Swiss-Prot record:
It is found in: Plastid, Chloroplast. A replicative DNA helicase, it participates in initiation and elongation during chromosome replication. Travels ahead of the DNA replisome, separating dsDNA into templates for DNA synthesis. A processive ATP-dependent 5'-3' DNA helicase it has DNA-dependent ATPase activity. This is Probable replicative DNA helicase. The gene is dnaB. The keyword Nucleotide-binding applies. One of its GO terms (biological process) is DNA replication, synthesis of primer. It comes from Trieres chinensis. Homohexamer. Residues 185-455 form the SF4 helicase domain.
Length: 455
């Protein structure tokens, strides 16, 4: 039991603080049978949300194991707790066996989480009330400091309540109104700048939670273009970039990056045929690039689950991610669907990539090959239907960009001025116009530039 001594403001045990033992037990039980349940709890429940100490220890252990990509069931959890010397503190193996025997109904998981969250906020509110009473007796701290401290804690509690997936129209439109006021007061892009003026004008930048497909036939410059974009973003915003290179090694990608940034021919760079001026440029560029949060993963044949785990791990380490890049889509493996029908497998992959973009609130760029049918046409310029043999890319993508270099197919073109021109076709934009822009491509450095350079 708990009550307050009005003279001291101290808490005296008189009754239990709000909690729900069964809801906590069922939620923990769910975590032992479903990775989706862990993700749901990770978004909604802190360790302190659990009232019972042994429940907090179990939940903390599960989160640590999950972040390390350790399989989670009663055996692995028991082993982890034993190794940490925590098994006696949680009540022994019998507590874990009780959780396994609970047989939770996952359909109601979010409701059980809501109950736990509700009790946690109520406990926090009660404790804040006791703190307010105690603070009223303290005279060596200014009243202003006390009120500011209490206000901050109350604001934090309010945020706990509003941390929900369903928004009322009032909250939603109020949020949009604030965003619009900010944008109108400052001429900024709505999303991340690609570094290419005409592309930004059409798209208003890459938006959080967008799946962006950059497609083209081989040798159109997909990797170079995407690497240019990623470099532009990390240099401008200093946000972590995670680049999955499923085709090229990290060394090959690094050479391309250095060549494009230092404007040194990649063959000369690889051969080490560098003059003094080149070396000076190279040292300066390497120093600048080394200070940027640019992360490359060149693990081949990655599954969608592996990519998701690596994104989550980097987010946990860096606290934020600016952009995720996958080069390229057709080299990925499905986590669950093992089918001879590659189209179905690619459909599952693109849907999962869109889910990753939404879950982590980050733009995801995926490079994609186009159908070989392009080569059989007289006019080689790609169209949206060239993606349709690659699963549901067209349906799942928010933006579809296609690269076309006429020089590749018409090397004897008499119009020399057009030889370095690449068409960037914005074939789909879920929330904006489509169109075609022109870029300059310099094959000497595998780098793209604005067709008309902007100040």
């Amino acid at each position: 039991m708990e009550k307050i001594n009005l003279k001291t403001g101290r808490l005296i045990v008189e009754k239990y603080l709000p909690h729900n033992f069964l809801a906590e037990k069922i939620v923990l039980s769910s975590l032992l049978i479903s990775s989706e349940a862990i993700e749901t709890c990770l978004r909604s429940l802190t360790i302190d949300a659990f009232y019972f100490k042994n429940h907090r220890e179990i939940y903390k252990a599960i989160l640590i194991m999950y972040k390390k990509n350790t399989p989670i069931d009663i055996v692995t959890l028991n082993t982890f707790l034993q190794n940490q010397g925590l098994l006696p503190k949680i009540g022994g193996i019998k507590v874990l066996i009780e959780l396994v025997n609970q047989l939770p109904n996952l359909v109601y998981l979010e409701e059980y989480i809501r109950i736990i969250q509700d009790k946690y906020v109520r406990r926090s509110l009660i404790k804040l009330g006791y703190e307010a009473i105690n603070s009223g007796y303290i005279t060596n701290i200014s009243l202003e400091e006390i009120l500011i401290s209490l206000e901050k804690q109350m604001f934090s509690l309010t945020n706990e309540i509003k941390n929900q997936d369903v928004f009322s129209s009032v909250d939603l439109f109020s949020q949009i109104l604030l965003e619009l006021k900010y944008k109108s007061s400052k001429p900024v892009l709505a999303g991340l700048s690609s570094g290419f003026y005409d592309l930004d004008s059409l798209t208003q930048g890459f938006q959080k939670s967008d799946l962006i497909i950059i497609a083209g036939r081989p040798s159109m410059g997909k990797t170079a273009f995407c690497l240019n974009i990623a470099t532009n973003i990390v240099k401008k915003y200093k946000l972590p970039i995670l680049f999955f290179s499923l085709e090229m090694s990290k060394e090959q990608l690094a050479y391309r990056l250095l060549s494009a940034e230092a404007l040194i021919n990649p063959m000369r760079l690889r051969n080490g045929h560098l003059n003094k001026k080149d070396w000076l440029k190279l040292h300066r560029i390497i120093k600048n690039l080394s200070s940027l949060p640019f992360f490359i993963d060149d693990t081949p044949n990655l599954s969608i689950q592996a990519i998701r785990s690596k994104v989550k791990k980097l987010l946990f380490e860096q606290n934020t991610i600016g952009l995720v890049v996958i080069d390229y889509l057709q080299l990925m493996q499905s986590s669950t669907l093992k089918s001879s029908n590659r189209v179905q497998e690619l459909s599952q992959i693109t849907r999962s990539l869109k889910n990753i973009a939404r879950e982590f609130n980050v733009p995801v760029i995926a490079l994609s090959q186009l159908s070989r049918n392009v080569e059989n046409r007289i006019i080689k310029r790609p169209i949206l239907s060239d993606l349709r043999e690659s699963g549901s890319i067209e349906q799942d993508a928010d933006l579809v960009l296609m690269l076309y270099r006429d020089q590749y197919y018409n090397s004897n073109n008499e119009n020399d001025e057009q030889l370095d021109i690449t068409e960037l076709i914005l074939a789909k934009q879920r929330n904006g116009p489509i169109g075609t822009i022109q870029l300059k491509f310099d094959a000497n450095y595998t780098k793209f530039f604005d067709y008309i350079l902007k100040d």
